[in-house]
């Protein structure tokens, strides 16, 4: 079943539609990984979205058991930029985010949220990563123009009800993505990549699919993978010492070489169309014991009262000493 899901996801990413925004699907990680955070600490979205871009997060410094609070994830990028879609056309970027909470924390229900929190999350559909990991939250894809910031409503656990939870400082891991990735779920390259020369040599010809695969000579058509059988796909032929080498370039990336140009193996033959990327941040979150807060307030009040009494006592002594001097 997992293989079928991955195949369907790859198909959706590659085919796309003409004017729809480029997709950012954190759900691909959900289908391929039991846990989206690797042992190294890296969130797996970075495995497909290779470009690094900033992510911002606002997390409360401390919360108490049962408190409903919000985590705000900022996904900044230049709204004037567009990137290539799967069919080679240009479109806006979608965004997505992953929040890895400490175990015991979970997504707040609508009934648990305040009216303000309901309004902040009204246009977002947030889901737990899985039944086994309700502390990991996913959202996306969402239109990036309207969702530069995403709000996650969260409920803090109560150690009295869950013995596995303790009053202590925890770590929250947050990943934010914008735009399509460079690696498809099946491991193949998307068209949101730089394509490079397969060998050292000279570019001798460029064959282009104008409408369908029949536009190419049979020997070149056989080289085109199914996901690249689209108008605008090009097959570049290079004359090398080892014979003729070919490179299939899907629609989207723009060629930066011309027929007759000499290239070295690994030289870029297209521009880099990617304008998106993934960012990850970490924040501390303290689960505070309200009893400790009460005792702290009582201690501070006692200190303040003691200081006040000392000041009054000092004034009293000064007055007595002044009276004795006058007497």
Swiss-Prot record:
Xref: Pfam families: Apocytochr_F_C, Apocytochr_F_N
One record GO biological process: photosynthesis
Membrane topology: Single-pass membrane protein
Chief location bin: membrane
Residues annotated as signal peptide: 1-24
Cofactor binding note of this UniProt entry: Binds 1 heme group covalently.
Cofactor(s) annotated in UniProt: heme
Keyword field: Electron transport, Heme, Iron, Membrane, Metal-binding, Photosynthesis, Signal, Thylakoid, Transmembrane, Transmembrane helix, Transport
Protein residues bound to heme: 25, 45, 48-49
Task of the protein: Component of the cytochrome b6-f complex, which mediates electron transfer between photosystem II (PSII) and photosystem I (PSI), cyclic electron flow around PSI, and state transitions.
HAMAP family the record matches: Cytb6_f_cytF (MF_00610)
Protein name: Cytochrome f
């Amino acid at each position: 079943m997992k293989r079928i899901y991955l195949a369907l996801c790859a198909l959706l990413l590659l085919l796309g539609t003409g004017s729809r925004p480029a997709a950012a699907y954190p759900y691909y990680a959900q289908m391929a990984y039991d846990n989206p955070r690797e042992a190294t600490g890296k969130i797996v979205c970075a495995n497909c979205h290779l470009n690094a871009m900033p992510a911002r997060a606002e997390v409360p410094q401390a919360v108490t058991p049962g408190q409903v609070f919000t985590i705000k994830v900022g996904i900044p990028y230049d709204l004037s930029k567009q990137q290539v879609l799967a069919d080679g056309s240009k479109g806006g970027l979608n965004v997505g985010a992953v929040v890895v909470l400490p175990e015991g924390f979970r997504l707040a229900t609508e009934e648990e949220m305040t009216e303000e929190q309901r309004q902040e999350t009204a246009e977002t559909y947030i889901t737990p990563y899985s039944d086994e990991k309700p502390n990991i939250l996913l959202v996306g894809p969402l239109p990036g123009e309207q969702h530069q910031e995403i709000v996650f409503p969260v409920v803090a656990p109560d150690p009295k009800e869950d013995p596995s939870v303790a009053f202590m400082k925890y770590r929250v891991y947050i990943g934010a993505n914008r735009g399509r990735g460079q690696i498809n779920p099946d491991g193949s390259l998307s068209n949101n990549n730089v394509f490079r020369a397969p060998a050292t040599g000279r570019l001798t010809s460029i064959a282009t699919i104008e409408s369908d695969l029949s536009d190419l000579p049979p020997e070149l058509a056989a080289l085109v993978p199914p996901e690249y059988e689209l108008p605008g796909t090009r097959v570049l032929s290079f004359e090398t010492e080892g014979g003729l080498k070919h490179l299939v370039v899907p629609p989207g990336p723009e060629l930066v070489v011309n027929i007759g140009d000499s290239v070295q193996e690994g030289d870029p033959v297209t521009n880099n169309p990617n304008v998106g990327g993934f960012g990850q941040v970490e924040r501390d979150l303290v689960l505070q014991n309200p009893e400790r807060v009460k005792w702290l307030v009582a201690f501070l009040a006692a200190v303040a009262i003691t200081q006040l009494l000392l000041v009054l006592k000092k004034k009293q002594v000064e007055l007595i000493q002044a009276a004795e001097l006058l007497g």
